Amino acid sequence: MSSSSEPVDDYLSSILGNIAGKKIAIISEVQELVEKTEHADLFQKVLAYCQKHGACVTTNHVEKYTSILPVYYTIAMAEASSTMNRFDGIRYTGTMAGESFLDIVKRTRSNLLGREVKRRIMIGNFVLSHEHYASYYLKAKQLASEIKQEFLKILNENDLILMPTTYGEAFTIGSKVSDPVSMYIEDIFTVTANILGVPAMSVPIAKGSNGLPLGLQLISRPFGEREIYNMADFLSHFGGEA
């Protein structure tokens, strides 16, 4: 873990109560996905609301955005499998009795690790294997770097990027346990900040058809938290009007 010595703003004083003159970026590739979701009308209303109060909305392209989810999960699974290697029942976590070291590790990891953790270890080991390292992991790292550069260029020219938090409203606990791919797809917008390594915030903006929250995500450049807090405060007054 590392930290920066760069001074940060007084975030409370950053909340100005208005967004006049702010440049809000939207991503056309995200827009195409939004049009297929429950967010479509709401997203347009939020953009109109921001423009009504003096913000400038710009449309931008990230050519490789459609690759962002597999890129993220390839890297995340690899990192997870590497990290989880330490949980062998000897040095970390609980332990299960066994006749040998390998038996202890096998029993411990089989019985104490959850299904999702096991899934990530298996996929991570696959993409890090000698046969697939270059075609999966290294390719994902290269694409992540290219996607990051495209986004940072946009953030250098705008104050914020605005996009939904998920495809739809919040889902109930356990509703997607049997369909992990469906759950992963819900991350398609939030993984952006992970790939970029920049600050982001999700704010509830309305309720969906089942009465559960719909969220919008605010993304800014490195150390751009003041823009996020100001916009989040502004959107807290959004009442659904255009």
Enumerate the language-model features and the residues they cover.
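Structural helix-boundary/capping segments
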Residues: 1-34, 44-53, 119-149, 157, ...
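Conserved Sensor-2/SRH helix of P-loop NTPases
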Residues: 84, 162, 211
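Amphipathic alpha-helical segments in well-structured domains
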Residues: 40-44, 77, 186-189, 232
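General small-molecule cofactor/ligand-binding pocket signal
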Residues: 56-61, 201
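Short, hinge-like loop/turn segments at secondary-structure boundaries
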Residues: 74-78, 180-181, 219-220
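Charged, often glycine-rich, active-site loop that binds/positions anionic groups
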Residues: 69-83
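A short glycine-threonine-serine/GTX helix/turn-capping micro-motif
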Residues: 12-13, 33, 71, 106-112
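Serine-dependent amide/ester hydrolase catalytic core
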Residues: 19, 65, 88-195
